[in-house]
């Protein structure tokens, strides 16, 4: 809230209580994040104008473990990785995923609250970089 107190029913407040329960039992929760998202060859505005029908993905076939396909998205993925590293979020890897245009980024594990914060930041960075690249 505006007094810097936790809101008891917020996701952050709930997570803090769960972490405290773990600590009281002698455990430490460590978490990692694997985020998957799609890259499109159209802007958000263009996709919206088409009523979100048939957006043009950056890839055209299954990308999972296809090292040649991911070179097409590498400028965007490199920018995402570099920006995350620059703000202190350690990226372990990124790769193309199953669906056309689907990407994955994995970050190193850390404590639960830090990972929750990082997860939100990673999503924001990925959206903004993708928006910049169109």
Model-flagged regions — what are they?
Residues 1-134:
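Glycine-rich, acidic/polar active-site loops that bind/position phosphate-bearing ligands
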């Amino acid at each position: 809230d505006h007094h810097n107190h936790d809101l008891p029913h917020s996701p952050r407040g709930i997570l803090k209580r769960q972490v405290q329960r773990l600590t009281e039992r002698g455990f430490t929760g460590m978490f990692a994040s694997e985020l998957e998202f799609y890259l499109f060859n159209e802007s958000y505005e263009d996709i919206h104008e088409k009523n979100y029908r048939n957006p043009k993905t950056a890839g055209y076939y299954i990308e999972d473990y296809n090292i040649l396909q991911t070179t097409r998205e590498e400028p965007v993925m490199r920018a995402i990785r570099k920006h995350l590293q620059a703000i202190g979020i350690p990226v372990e890897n990124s790769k193309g995923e199953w669906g056309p245009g689907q990407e994955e980024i994995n970050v190193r594990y850390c404590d639960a609250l830090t990972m929750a914060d990082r997860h939100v930041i990673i999503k924001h960075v990925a959206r903004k970089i993708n928006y910049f690249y169109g």
